[in-house]
């Protein structure tokens, strides 16, 4: 039942136009409105749970870089840890898709945070923000940036808002762009 089996593929722009025509003709504002609302509610409940808050705030001494860490180095490391954990939550779709996520324990969240954080743009992203995860020789490298944040999926937006608040607390100016229609 794969759409490419019959060699019929509809370009995404055409598909979007056809959906818009259907919605305009049927006077349905958004057929997925209830599902989007449930995703946002699930994500908000997961983020607000004691288990999630506890895991986000848990810190081991070795996380700060050892016993000879400086205050500047510790602050830099804390920024890195907090942002990394929030970004990890932003890609954990189960938080807003599955009901089981409401029953995650602190250990479940800590296992999520222990996953390797990789990708082509990870180092460049943290460097752009001035968050290196370690103390730099020249002191703090945090220079406020202007960031365009694209928010496009219900559920995920709840985590995005927490990340945006963190970036604003760090002095960055964040402009949020939403896709057309309710998120």
Where are the regions that the model predicts?
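Electropositive, gly/pro-rich neighborhoods at or near active sites that engage anionic ligands
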Residues: 1-146
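Redox- and metal-dependent alpha/beta enzyme cores, enriched for Fe-S-associated oxidoreductases
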Residues: 158-183
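Short, glycine-rich nucleotide/cofactor-binding loops
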Residues: 147-159
